[in-house]
Amino acid sequence: MVLDEYMWMVIVGFIIAFVLAFSVGANDVANSFGTAVGSGVVTLRQACILASIFETIGSVLLGAKVGETIRKGIIDVNLYNNTVDLLMAGEVSAMVGSAVWQLIASFLKLPVSGTHCIVGATIGFSLVAVGAHSVQWMQLVKIVASWFISPLLSGLMSGALFLMIKFFILNKEDPVPNGLKALPVFYAATIGINVFSILFTGAPLLGLQTFPVWATALLSVGIAIVFALVVWFFVCPWMKKKIASRLKKEGALSRISEESLDKIQDEDTSVFKELPGAKGNDESVLPLTSSSPDAAVSSESVSNGNTRVPYGRAASMTNGSIRSPFSNGTFNFDGHTVKSDAHVYHTVHKDSGLYKDLLHNIHLDRVKIDRSAPENNYRILRRNNSYTCYTAAICGVPVHSTFKSSDIAMPEDSEKLVGDTVSFSKKRLRYDSYSSYCNAVAEAEIEAEEGGVEMKLAAELADPNPPQDDSLEEDKEEKDKSQVHLLFHFLQILTACFGSFAHGGNDVSNAIGPLVALWLIYQQGGVMQEASTPVWLLLYGGVGICAGLWVWGRRVIQTMGKDLTPITPSSGFTIELASAFTVVVASNIGLPISTTHCKVGSVVAVGWIRSRKAVDWRLFRNIFLAWFVTVPVAGLFSAGVMAILQYGILPYV
């Protein structure tokens, strides 16, 4: 059968296939490198470079076999024997439906399954072209089951693995000995699982599609053992020296900082003489500032009878810590009157960078000659570090240096004060490495009021009987120790690269599977598509995936690596390894599984174990709803395009 009159559909198909590959790169590649970027082991640029390399290699070596299912496993192609043009139009429609929904999901920063997109789109066009009897509905049942099986199974495996790592390594006072002992096991598991996955999938170009399962398992175990021995005899000694060097360097820097600070404090300056706890104490509680710089030399009474305390003054001393209560009064916040109705205390340790910044800022305020036009040269206070609004209240540092209308375009995670109004976006508080120094959790509720700004500040440290919760434990668990970071740093990069390689082989079929079907139908003039997948088509899909990653991939990477829950190298490695193991096991025993759903389930499970409040459950709800609507929405888009082609274009061609 000569199909030259349908050459236009092939051309349109190639264009749309690139857009589809672009959408897959923008959305699905976050599965591989989202956690690595979130934990900080690689930058976004490095992740894009590594993912581009491994996605392309994986798509060429592994993509051919996986594409068979997408082309023939969802619909009965024999029903199109006498209507080849309808099948070609259907493949174009499927690519449009899948691409549109994945681009929408990427715009919304929601990770969705590329496989489910193309399956839903294929079902959509087939319902319009032939009817319900053309669809293999069991595939749809498996997809629905995977919504629950994938995240649950992967979450359980990730949680169990992370609890083991937490118990044997992270919770130890010195995690290095146990970490070094476990390192060969981790490398062996990573290599073994991923090698088995690659061999089990089969690479037609390498002649691996005929490997029996027992040979695949034996070869994977052998390679894993070899890597374990290499790590034990070469990597572990090198890692031990590197960790010792890092700790020695950190200790030297800490001593230098302490000596420098002590030397400064010994100088005969009024600034340090007046600072509470400047000598002889490891911690000081700095009070709120007075309502204006000029009032710092004298105390005033506030409405409730408490004393307003200037810089470096204290109202009371308890157990060597100087505390200043401040309640139901007002203070000056960069020229704006701010009211507070809560007691505010804040402990600042002398060995922290925050303490030194406070000293420096106070010194600058004291030595200024011209107070008529003060300048605020402080850095922007961002929600993601220790400079929160209560820190600003303590040292008189504004949230932003100016309050002009042009300042509205600030980073979305900053708190913004604009004139007499407040633009405040409530987000989940994230703790960082400063939490070991600042053991107070503050929550700010800022409301715009006529005639000024009302700020409600609360610090749990001020409560003599604080609630017995695990907030301090969560602070400590938020960041890995430097030794743990080094142990898991390269491990997470390795698992991410393997995951990217496997993803390229699996998901390139979602991008160019319909295009391969379209090309083979056009070449052979029939619907059976007996020829093998051309390598150049796989490479074409790989290039499209990389383009999408570079242009738009950061959106979903941010969701997977940062927004859903904070990631550390240890938790990121756990997520990568457990989700990969889940995919391999579930695929081998016939359970319906989705890589995207597995990764999201692992991220949520590990995040919940590390800190009960660390998971953004609202975001997870939105992701789950996106999974739920993926198949019907992609199917509707595809069905609409198919109806236009079948009834509006093909009859007139």
Swiss-Prot record:
Q: In which residue ranges is the amino acid composition biased (Low complexity)?
A: 290-303
Cytoplasmic compartment residues: 27-46, 108-109, 164-187, 239-483, 554-572, 611-622
Cellular-component GO terms for this entry: apical plasma membrane; brush border membrane; plasma membrane
What are the annotated glycosylation sites?
N81
| UniProt-annotated stretches for the region Disordered | 275-310
Keyword list, A-Z: Cell membrane, Glycoprotein, Ion transport, Membrane, Phosphate transport, Receptor, Sodium, Sodium transport, Symport, Transmembrane, Transmembrane helix, Transport
* Transmembrane region(s): 6-26, 47-67, 87-107, 110-130, 143-163, 188-208, 218-238, 484-504, 533-553, 573-587, 595-610, 623-643
Output the GO biological process annotations, alphabetical, semicolon-separated. Answer: phosphate ion transmembrane transport
Catalytic activity, as annotated: 2 Na(+)(out) + phosphate(out) = 2 Na(+)(in) + phosphate(in)
Q: How does it sit in the membrane?
A: Multi-pass membrane protein
Q: Which residues lie on this side of the membrane: Extracellular?
A: 1-5, 68-86, 131-142, 209-217, 505-532, 588-594, 644-653
Q: How does it assemble?
A: Homodimer.
Question: What is the protein's known function?
Answer: Sodium-phosphate symporter which preferentially transports the monovalent form of phosphate with a stoichiometry of two sodium ions per phosphate ion.
Q: What is the name of this protein?
A: Sodium-dependent phosphate transporter 2
Upper taxonomic classification of the species?
Eukaryota, Metazoa, Chordata, Craniata, Vertebrata
